[in-house]
């Protein structure tokens, strides 16, 4: 019988890109899930609903997949990190990158329901260290997207117009309804 590893991640996978991942300049869809983090830089005129979201760092997914191949027995494990909300992300980005404060979206407070998910079983069964914290994942994803943006600017892409583009904002919020237009 062949061993099977079936990844199931009911959360958003974020994290930095691999060094050889190439995104066509101006192609925001190429940012994939990192677009959610890039959306926080849409400017104060963009208002985000304060939704909670779970995440798993892409580096943790890779390690879990390899570890899953090596374990014996049948297991059902959830790949998830702690849940956080948009307001916490904005506050965290402000604390680590105060230079971005004028570029950050605003957040409308709403009531929060945070699902309870415990990654400790997966960590224990797979024999892995603690998963990447949401703060580290956000910081690394933010830096990766800013690096991409910097490369785009070098070849003439107007990053400001990308962030102001309602098509971009629609792509960012597709399925999440997390962008409220204020104009």
Where does each model-flagged region fall?
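Conserved beta-strand elements of beta-rich interaction domains across eukaryotes
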Residues: 12-13, 84
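Conserved C-terminal active-site "lid" loop/helix of NAD(P)H-dependent oxidoreductases
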Residues: 108-129
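A structural motif corresponding to the C-terminal end of an alpha-helix
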Residues: 1-5, 129
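Glycine/proline-rich active-site loop of Rossmann-fold NAD(P)-dependent oxidoreductases
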Residues: 2-3, 15-33, 67-77
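A conserved pocket-lining segment of Rossmann-fold NAD(P)-dependent short-chain dehydrogenase/reductase
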Residues: 26-56
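Conserved sequence/active-site signature of Rossmann-fold short-chain dehydrogenase/reductase
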Residues: 13-15, 61
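Mid/C-terminal beta-alpha module of Rossmann-like enzyme folds, strongest
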Residues: 51-55, 62-109, 119, 133-134, ...
């Amino acid at each position: 019988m062949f061993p099977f590893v079936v990844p199931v991640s009911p959360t958003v996978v974020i994290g930095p890109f691999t060094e050889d991942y190439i995104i066509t300049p101006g192609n925001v869809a190429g940012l994939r899930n990192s677009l959610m983090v890039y959306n926080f830089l849409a400017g104060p005129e963009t208002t985000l609903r304060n939704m909670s979201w779970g995440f798993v760092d892409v580096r943790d997914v890779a390690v879990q997949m390899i570890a899953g191949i090596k374990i014996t027995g049948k297991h059902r494990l959830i790949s998830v990190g702690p849940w956080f909300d948009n307001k916490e992300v904005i506050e965290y980005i402000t604390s680590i990158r105060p230079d971005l404060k004028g570029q950050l979206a605003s957040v409308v407070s709403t009531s929060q329901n945070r699902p309870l998910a415990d990654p400790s079983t997966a960590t224990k069964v797979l024999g892995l260290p603690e998963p990447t914290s949401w703060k580290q994942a956000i910081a690394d994803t933010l830096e990766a997207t800013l690096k991409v943006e910097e490369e785009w600017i070098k070849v003439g892409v107007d990053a400001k117009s990308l962030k102001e583009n309602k098509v971009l904002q629609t792509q960012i919020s597709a399925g999440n309804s997390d962008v409220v237009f204020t104009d």
